[in-house]
Regions:
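Bacterial Sec-dependent N-terminal signal peptides
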Residues: 1-23
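Short, aromatic-enriched amphipathic alpha-helices that serve as compact interaction elements
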Residues: 20-35
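Short solvent-exposed beta->alpha transition segments
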Residues: 22, 43-80
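Solenoid-repeat scaffolds in large eukaryotic assemblies
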Residues: 38-39
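A mature extracytoplasmic/lumenal domain signature
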Residues: 43-45, 53-55, 83-85, 97-100, ...
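Surface-exposed, charged secondary-structure patches
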Residues: 65-104
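Short beta-strand edge/turn micro-motifs at domain boundaries
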Residues: 104-132
Length: 132
């Protein structure tokens, strides 16, 4: 009798981790291909976005335009996640390096759990201090 609740909790945890990994994978794939439309599909309605030295809270439509300009000026070649963790508020975060034709950028994004899924609440694309 006691095994059923434990199994249900375990299954819910596994499903939550898979949803989180799926969103992370979609973000990485959109960054690799330079697809702002696919990227903003993973965002909360108003995202905290930093691209190079410009930072503000933008709607998805505004963020898509900003990211389109960035990808046009810096065509992506590859992206690799180097670190992942959890903030003190329970948000998952990922840090990676985006390699473009013009150089390297450090990418950080935070995932927030919203109802039954995860969404990107913050994305930072900053000049990388050390090219790989």
């Amino acid at each position: 009798m006691n095994r059923i609740p434990v199994l249900l909790v375990g299954m819910l945890l596994v499903l939550g981790l898979r949803a989180q990994d799926a969103v992370k994978d979609q973000v990485v794939q959109a960054m690799k291909t330079g697809s702002p439309k696919e990227l903003v599909a993973q965002f909360i309605p108003n995202i905290d976005l930093t691209v190079k030295e410009v930072s503000d809270v933008y709607s998805r439509a505004q963020a898509e335009q900003i990211l389109r300009k960035f990808f046009n000026e810096n065509p992506p070649v590859d992206m690799v996640i180097e670190h992942k963790g959890e903030s003190k508020f329970g948000d998952k975060y990922y840090i990676g390096i985006l390699r473009t034709r013009t150089g390297y950028f450090r990418v950080t994004f935070f995932l927030k759990r919203t109802e039954d899924t995860y969404q990107v609440k913050q994305l930072r694309i900053e000049n990388s201090k050390n090219d790989l």
